[in-house]
Swiss-Prot record:
Metal-binding as UniProt keyword: yes
GO biological process, one term: nitrogen fixation
Lineage: Bacteria, Bacillati, Cyanobacteriota, Cyanophyceae, Oscillatoriophycideae
UniProt-listed PROSITE patterns: NIFH_FRXC_1 (PS00746), NIFH_FRXC_2 (PS00692), NIFH_FRXC_3 (PS51026)
Cofactor: how bound: Binds 1 [4Fe-4S] cluster per dimer.
Pfam families: Fer4_NifH
Modified how: The reversible ADP-ribosylation of Arg-100 inactivates the nitrogenase reductase and regulates nitrogenase activity.
Residue numbers bearing the ADP-ribosylarginine modification: R100
Gene Ontology terms, MF aspect: 4 iron, 4 sulfur cluster binding; ATP binding; metal ion binding; nitrogenase activity
Keyword hit for Transmembrane helix: no
Protein name: Nitrogenase iron protein
Record organism: Trichodesmium erythraeum (strain IMS101)
Gene this protein is translated from: nifH
E.C. designation(s): 1.18.6.1
Subunit organization: Homodimer.
Matches recorded under PANTHER family: LIGHT-INDEPENDENT PROTOCHLOROPHYLLIDE REDUCTASE IRON-SULFUR ATP-BINDING PROTEIN
Length: 296
């Protein structure tokens, strides 16, 4: 059994990318998969279950009074392609630590024997947060392969670099490795070249470039993956290619995160960030505009 995790900046399309890819892995390649959603939004399994947010382990545990009183079939639901789906959940906003929900859920699943008869367990983890709780799949050596969903946008690349730092921190203590960057395209100029360059500097690969296509949104509105909604579409073939690459991936590395100066140099090189001279010109132009407005 292989345990993988998808990380990435909030809003990058991580849950969408992971569910579409896992659907292809299960439906086309017969992989037995369990998804463990590690995001308090509980949206990591929606497209697989064709449903609204799934009832979470923490929610049921709160109703029962203790996680020991939860039955496995209350929180583990089968979905498209026979994929088993679980959402860890989290506390009310502003109260407690959502990371504890992940720890509680994983321990519960292990004790209930949910990890048997599987080829893959996939953890879908909140945004770019690599604090203790959200890093739990990495820290406790649960997830052995980390896939970072990113794009050619500046903040997505910052997040990818930060996540690589988190992987590096635990790589020597455990067996966690970086499996690659998945570029979920935002149609940025020279995006493929940029992410390939970033991947090389991080000592990894751009495992796949997922083009932008409106069929993904059309499927999402129906709470489906593209694999279920339009299996003959070109986009379904893209997710299938990514699925095959993950199944066959042997390039698992210890990342070499960039220093901030190095990352900024890369962004400047590709025109995503101006150099110091450009920055000073921007500031001067803004100051002039403010003064002109004030003088009216």
């Amino acid at each position: 059994m292989r345990q993988i995790a998808f990380y990435g900046k909030g809003g990058i399309g991580k849950s969408t990318t992971s569910q579409n890819t896992l659907a292809a892995m299960a439906n086309r390649h017969g992989q037995r998969i369990m998804i463990v959603g590690c995001d308090p939004k509980a949206d990591s399994t929606r497209l697989i279950l064709n449903a609204k947010a799934q009832t979470t382990v923490l929610h049921v545990a709160a109703e029962r009074g203790a996680v020991e009183d939860v039955e496995l079939d209350e929180v583990l639901k089968p979905g498209f392609g026979g994929i088993k789906c679980v959402e860890s959940g989290g506390p009310e906003p502003g109260v407690g630590c959502a990371g504890r929900g992940i720890i509680t859920a994983i321990n519960f699943l292990e004790e209930e024997g949910a990890y048997t008869d599987l080829d893959f367990v996939s953890y879908d983890v909140l945004g770019d947060v690599v604090c203790g709780g959200f890093a739990m799949p990495i820290r406790e050596n649960k997830a052995q392969e980390i896939y970072i969903v990113c794009s050619g946008e500046m903040m997505a690349m910052y997040a990818a670099n930060n996540i690589a730092r988190g992987v590096l921190k635990y790589a020597h203590a455990g067996g966690v490795r970086l499996g690659g960057l998945i570029c979920n395209s935002r149609k940025v100029d020279r995006e493929t070249e940029l992410i390939e360059n970033l991947a090389a500097r991080l000592n990894t690969q751009m495992i796949h470039f997922v083009p932008r296509d409106n069929v993904v949104q059309r499927a999402e509105i129906r709470r489906m993956t593209v694999e279920q909604y339009a299996p003959e579409d070109n986009q379904a073939q893209e997710y299938d290619q990514l699925a095959q690459k993950i199944i066959n991936n042997e390039k698992l590395t210890i990342p070499t995160p960039l220093e901030m100066d190095e990352l900024e140099e890369l962004l400047i090189e590709f025109g995503l960030l101006g150099d110091e001279e450009d920055r000073q010109k921007q500031i001067a132009a803004q100051d002039a505009a403010i003064k002109a407005t004030a003088a009216k």
